[in-house]
Regions:
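Structured catalytic/nucleic-acid-binding cores of DNA maintenance enzymes
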Residues: 1-298
Length: 298
């Protein structure tokens, strides 16, 4: 949402300072970004020349943002994601425009608590750990590498820092992509092929249809359920923390084969996800327990 909100409808100057994506950057250079969405851990950005940018950040990939960044306020709820070819969802999240020196976002599909904050000081904090633009592991390592440069740069366009696979630039916003597992261009058919390989995402599309797909995918496999939940073809984008928590909350042994897990438990897990994941997006944390109280630890 943040890339769509910041760059949507704007003509992009694309380059590959590292050189590994030079041909791809040249093909989208000068195009307008028309849409952007994520399924699981993969991002798909559409351009007006018919090409799609597909990015999978993996473990170490990250986006560094510079200049004017438009974040999304999720405090009132999480909007539905509409896939290509589907009718647009009626709900939406308000955009909150911010201007800051820099920031980071990593791990597509994850959001930070400061998405609902309203001042630059809250967005870019002292160490970046809770910044709306410092999202995804390993945050502290990345922040430690570039804190000085990111915090003090006034040059425009920003100086290239480190290894940048792709830079997307407008007259007021810049995003640098570093270390992704996948960065490629696709046509419409290519996007469909990738989406067809992915399991349902609890944050994307019709939850009821996703539930049926998940139950079917998990129930036919003899693989341990704990392993199945990390298979992106079974369910997209859950991740290790939610996997462990959901299994614990459902009282399911992670070593139990998928085809031995009662259907009622599979459905219980899916419905739990469809509640927990939007909560996590809304508050900017992986929250699996309500009502936690106590003094803040510093």
């Amino acid at each position: 949402d943040q890339i769509r909100a910041t760059f949507g409808g704007r003509r992009i100057t694309a380059s590959s300072p590292q050189g590994r994506f030079a041909d791809g950057a040249a093909r989208i250079n000068g195009s307008v970004l028309t849409d952007c969405f994520a399924v699981g851990k993969q991002m798909f950005a559409a351009f007006d020349n018919g090409l799609w940018l597909r990015v999978h950040l993996g473990i170490y990939g990250a986006w560094d943002f510079w200049g004017e960044v438009t974040a999304v306020d999720y405090s009132a709820g999480v909007p539905s994601v509409t896939l290509p070819g589907a009718e647009p969802a009626a709900d939406s999240a308000p955009l909150v425009e911010r201007v800051g020196d820099s920031g980071r976002i990593g791990q597509t599909g994850e959001y930070a608590a400061a998405n609902r904050m309203h001042t630059v000081a809250q967005i870019v904090d002292a160490d970046g750990e809770d910044s709306a633009l410092s999202i995804g592991a390993p945050r502290r390592r990345r922040m430690a590498e570039h804190d000085t440069e990111l915090a003090t740069s006034e040059q425009w366009p920003p100086e290239i820092v480190g290894t940048v696979r792709l830079r997307m630039l407008t007259d007021r916003s810049c995003a640098d992509l570093r270390g992704p597992t996948v960065c490629e261009l696709l046509d419409d058919a290519g996007v469909e092929r990738v989406l067809d390989r992915l399991g349902p995402d609890p944050l994307v599309g019709d939850p009821a249809a996703g539930e049926e797909r998940f139950v079917k995918n998990a129930a036919r496999r003899r693989v341990p359920i704990g392993q199945l939940l990390m298979d992106q073809a079974v369910v997209a984008g859950i991740g290790n923390i939610y996997r462990a928590e959901i299994l614990f909350r459902a009282g399911i042994d992670p070593h139990l084969p998928g085809n031995e897990v009662p259907e009622s438990k599979l459905r219980e897990m899916w419905r739990d996800w469809t509640q927990l994941l939007p909560d996590g997006v809304r508050v900017g944390r992986m929250m699996t327990i309500d009502g936690l109280t106590g003094e803040q630890w510093e």
